[in-house]
Amino acid sequence: MKTAATIALFCAGGGLTRYYLSGWIYGLLGRAFPYGTLVVNIIGAYCIGLIMELGLRSTMLSDTLRIGLTVGFMGGLTTFSTFSYETFKLLEDGQFVMAFTNVLASVAVCLLCTWLGIITVRSLA
């Protein structure tokens, strides 16, 4: 029960962070491209690499905290469903280059950031 409560609490924090951070990004850059979703997914990709590698290489994070941060906070922060919907809407609106850019940037940059999170922890070891 402790783990489930931790996940729920962290998920709420991640969801609120996504709401405010993506809203702020859209306020800065506009909504012509799904910048807000891309930014939160990039941040989440880096952080999950960092947290998982830290959890595997040290005792700094308890299993409950690691699960709360990854399943809860990162699960609430990042969103594949919004990425899918926004990409579909770009395609539907005939914005093929923007849709392709979103897919390429989301996949490539998020994979790169996950790797950077892992490398960050490994460089500290």
Curated annotation (Swiss-Prot):
Q: Which reaction does it catalyse?
A: fluoride(in) = fluoride(out)
Membrane topology of the entry: Multi-pass membrane protein
Q: What GO molecular function terms would the record report? A: fluoride channel activity; metal ion binding
Q: Which domain of life is it from?
A: Bacteria
User: Which terms does the UniProt entry file under GO BP?
Assistant: cellular detoxification of fluoride
Would you tell me the Gene Ontology cellular component terms?
plasma membrane
Major place of residence:
membrane
Pfam families associated with the record: CRCB (PF02537)
State the name under which the record lists this protein: Fluoride-specific ion channel FluC
* Native source species: Trichlorobacter lovleyi (strain ATCC BAA-1151 / DSM 17278 / SZ)
